[in-house]
């Protein structure tokens, strides 16, 4: 079961800063893992309608690892024929160049906006499925993301 840390209504800001868990300050020397759930009320009960990716972020005072500052992509768009493949080439720009990125999960995670047009593997291999266009999202461990446009002819 999910632990609710903070509820935000649609009219509120799109960003939220959480500084305490269970009335205690967050230890900034440790890594943080979290995700966001969006829900709506149906017959007086909360029904989850969306879930963000889970992020793994280094605490601000962590001296052993760092987070991604941004993601650099070799290409930001691909035009493919149905059935053809392409591989995403990406690199991370670190906040602190001397420290490694959190490495207990893969360096990059991928998602597609429309799996009928193109799918992407956990290794970043894009496969064109059907005619149309979609976006492929490349996520770093801390949720930093870049978007790639894919057109399938």
Listing of model-derived features with the role each one plays in the protein:
Residues 61-153:
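Extracytoplasmic soluble-region selector
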Residues 28-32, 49-52, 101-109:
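Glycine-rich, flexible loop segments associated with nucleotide phosphate handling
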Residues 43-61:
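Extracellular fibronectin type III
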Residues 6-12, 117-120:
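Short beta-strand segments within Ig-like beta-sandwich modules, predominantly Fibronectin type-III
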Residues 14-16, 124:
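Short strand-edge motifs at loop-to-beta-strand transitions and within beta-strands
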Residues 3-6, 49, 145:
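Local beta-strand/beta-hairpin segments that build beta-sheet-rich folds
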Residues 18-44:
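Beta-strand-rich modules
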Residues 8, 52-53, 71, 76:
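Generic beta-strand hydrophobic packing signal
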């Amino acid at each position: 079961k999910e632990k609710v840390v903070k509820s935000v209504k649609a009219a509120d800001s799109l960003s939220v800063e959480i500084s305490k868990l269970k009335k205690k300050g967050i230890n900034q020397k440790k890594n943080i893992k979290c995700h966001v759930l969006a829900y709506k009320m149906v017959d007086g009960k909360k029904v989850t309608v969306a879930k963000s990716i889970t992020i793994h972020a280094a605490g601000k005072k962590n001296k052993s690892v760092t987070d991604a500052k941004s993601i650099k992509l070799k290409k930001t768009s691909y035009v493919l024929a149905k059935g053809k493949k392409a591989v995403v080439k990406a690199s991370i720009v670190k906040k602190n160049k001397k420290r490694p990125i959190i490495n207990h999960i893969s360096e990059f995670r991928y998602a597609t906006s429309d799996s009928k047009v193109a799918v992407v593997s956990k290794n970043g291999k894009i496969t064109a499925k059907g005619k149309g266009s979609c976006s492929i999202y490349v996520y770093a461990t801390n949720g930093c993301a870049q978007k790639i446009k894919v057109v399938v002819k």
